A protein has these predicted regions:
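N-terminal Rossmann-like FAD-binding beta1-loop-alpha1 element of flavoenzymes
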Residues: 3-30
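Conserved N-terminal/central alpha/beta ligand/cofactor-binding core
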Residues: 33-127
Length: 159
């Protein structure tokens, strides 16, 4: 059975989007061009992984340009910075908050964060294909019909 949703990119946003869609019952395929998920997470905060910030959401949004803040505001209110921390700590990650409000893993390794996010994907039944760059998003009649990868077209109605 083909996926209902294909998510392109297994960075933080792609991982969370895939996991949440699968939680809501969708058959999800997550495509990543790199040989592992979370490549950008692994280098965030100098490899220590600045998970999020402890501030209020509106304070966080002020750090973005106005157009960016308008774009991400709805997603930030649907899945808050505090929920991200709870998601990780509920799986055993210990975190601490620096005086500037940035939240990091106690053991200062992004690998732990990526491993926990990977466990959420597996638990939700998300299919992950690594080393699979997307060539293009395929359209017919103004509608998405799939994504093209090296092996051919993966049919799906949502990307």
């Amino acid at each position: 059975m083909p996926p209902e949703i294909v998510v392109v990119g297994a960075g933080a946003a792609g991982i969370i989007a895939s996991w949440r869609a699968a939680q809501l019952g969708a058959k999800v395929l997550l495509l990543e061009k790199n040989p592992r998920i979370g490549t950008k997470i692994l280098v965030s905060g100098g490899g220590k992984c600045n998970i999020t910030h402890d501030g209020e959401l509106e304070d966080l949004l002020r750090a973005f340009r106005p157009a960016e803040a308008r774009f991400i505001r709805p997603a930030c209110y649907r899945f808050t910075n505090r929920e991200i921390v709870k998601m990780l700590t509920s799986r055993g990650l210990e975190v601490y908050t620096r005086p500037d409000g940035r939240i990091f893993p106690v053991h200062q390794t992004a690998k732990d964060v990526v491993a926990i996010l990977g466990s959420y994907l597996a638990e939700a039944g998300v299919e992950v294909r690594l080393s699979t760059p997307v060539k293009r998003i395929a359209h017919e009649g103004g509608h998405v019909v799939g994504v093209e990868v090296a092996d051919g077209l993966i049919s799906c109605p949502r990307v």
